[in-house]
């Protein structure tokens, strides 16, 4: 159920007065800079949540490719980028912008590119396949949910 998978950003978006952005610098540098600038300029509390791979993710191609990993996460639909600016709603403008596009990457290939997931696939392939499929379905539901927010908050994709 996608209701159970809503994240930290959703909690604060519902407050109605908190600027919230989800970013991945390697996926879209301009969106990242824009979100940080908007958060800084916003006259109330701001929350910027970034996808930032670390050594414990076990990126198979190495940490020097962290920016590429961020891009792959967004392309696969593992991570979505958006901005919610309540000040825009007060101005009669769209408050929500879903900045990432519909996923086009291979979700399971993305998961298998990180040791933290790949280890499960090696240890228990059947269970990994089940969990990876469930995770992919949840990610699709999450994107659909974010698309619905465009209508709810008045926004763009």
Q: How would you name each of these model-derived features?
A:
Residues 13-17:
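Gly-rich Lys/Arg/Thr-decorated short loops/hinges at beta-loop-alpha junctions or inter-strand turns
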Residues 25-33:
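Active-site glycine- and acidic-residue-rich loops that bind
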Residues 34-130, 134, 144-148:
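Glycine/aspartate-rich loop-and-adjacent alpha/beta segment that forms the canonical ThDP
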Residues 136-157:
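Short, amphipathic C-terminal "tail helix"
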């Amino acid at each position: 159920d996608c209701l159970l998978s809503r994240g930290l950003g959703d909690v604060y978006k519902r407050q109605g007065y908190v600027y919230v952005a989800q970013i991945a610098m390697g996926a879209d540098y301009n969106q990242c800079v824009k979100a940080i600038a908007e958060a800084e300029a916003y006259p109330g509390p701001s929350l910027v949540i970034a996808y930032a791979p670390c050594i414990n993710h076990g990126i198979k191609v190495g940490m020097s490719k962290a920016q590429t990993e961020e891009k792959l996460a967004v392309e696969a639909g593992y991570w979505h980028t958006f901005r919610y600016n309540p000040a825009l709603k007060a101005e009669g403008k769209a408050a929500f912008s879903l900045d990432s596009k519909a996923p086009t990457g291979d979700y399971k290939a993305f998961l298998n590119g990180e040791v933290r997931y790949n280890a499960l696939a090696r240890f228990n392939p059947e269970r990994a396949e089940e969990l990876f499929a469930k995770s992919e379905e949840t990610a699709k539901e999450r994107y659909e949910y974010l698309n619905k927010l465009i209508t709810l908050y008045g926004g763009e994709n």
